[in-house]
Amino acid sequence: MQNYFEFFNLPEQFAIDLQGLDQAYKKIQRLVHPDRFVTATEAEKRTAMQWAAMANDAYRTLGDPVRRSAYLCELNGYHVRKETHVSMDPEFLMQQLEWRELLQEARETGNRPMLEKLAEQQLHVRQKQMEVVENSLNRRQYENAAQEIRKMMF
């Protein structure tokens, strides 16, 4: 079975041509559209539906940078969502707790400037995390990338 990159004829790497992904997706969807299988056998309809479902899943996965990163790690034997990965950096956990407390306080008091500041901080942290993930994937350091992705999913 093909992986999602092969399915869309894209290089197996983090940086992909999103326009190329979109075009490949639309081409496959046109080929397996139900209107084309009105007079087909049940087996042909089922196969077309399976192709459409795979195209949808592959498109959602590759179109999202975090999902794409996790998928690349998993293709290379590093499972991001495994329950066995329960330990996190204590500093990271403390930062998460602090942010959640500040967020709760800002919501309860209606402190809009604080909410905006927290959102800005979170965006900055997420951008830095994505840079770490991309650099790790480019260097084929899948364990580092997987660890950072877990933080992003926390």
Predicted regions located by residue number:
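C-terminal accessory/regulatory regions appended to core domains
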Residues: 1-154
